[in-house]
Amino acid sequence: MTWQNDYSRDYEVENHMECQNRSDKYIWSPHDAYFYKGLSELIVDIDRLIYLSLEKIRKDFVFINLNTDSLTEFINRDNEWLSAVKGKQVVLIAARKSEALANYWYYNSNIRGVVYAGLSRDIRKELAYVINGRFLRKDIKKDKITDREMEIIRMTAQGMLPKSIARIENCSVKTVYTHRRNAEAKLYSKLYKLVQ
C-alpha cells in the first residue's frame, strides 16, 4: 500500500469520526447510504414503539453499523471511536460475524445495547427494545470476545505475525493460535478475512 493510500484511508477515517461527532449525524457511517436511509426510515417507522421523541434520538443517540466492511476500522481505532461517542447513547447494529465483538464492546464500554441483525425476527421490536433502555446483559445472545482475544485480534489487524504477538503478550505461539481459533469460532470467520 502506498503512502497516498494510507493518507487517504486515514483522512477517510477522520472524516467518519468528524461526521459521527456532528449532532446531525446520528447514524454511523453516514457514507453507507443504504444503511443510513434504511435505519432512518426504520426509526421513524417505530416512533409509536419508543418512549423518546425522534428529536431526542437524533440528538442523544449514535447508531453504529458493525459490518464486515468496517470491522478493521473499529478494531484498530476502538479507543478513538469510543471516545468520539462519549456522552452519547450508542446502539450497535451487529451483523452475524460481528456479534461477539459487539458483545465485547457492550461489556467493556458504555454501550446502550446491541441489535443482532442476523438473529432478529422483528428488527423493529429489537431496535425499540434497545432504544427504550431495556437491553441488559441477560439479552446477550452470543459469546463475547475475551480481553486476551481482543488484544490478539487488534495485533492481527495491524499485520503482526503470531510469533511477534507471542513475544509482546509474553506467551507461546501455540497460545496465540489457540486464542485466534477461539476468536475465529466466535466470529464465524478467519481473522485474516475480517481484518484485511
Swiss-Prot record:
SUPFAM superfamilies: C-terminal effector domain of the bipartite response regulators. Keywords: Activator, Cytoplasm, DNA-binding, Transcription, Transcription regulation. GO terms for biological process: regulation of DNA-templated transcription. Residues 162-181 bind DNA. SMART domains: HTH_LUXR. The keyword Translocase does not apply. It is found in: Cytoplasm. This is HTH-type transcriptional regulator EcpR. It comes from Escherichia coli O157:H7.
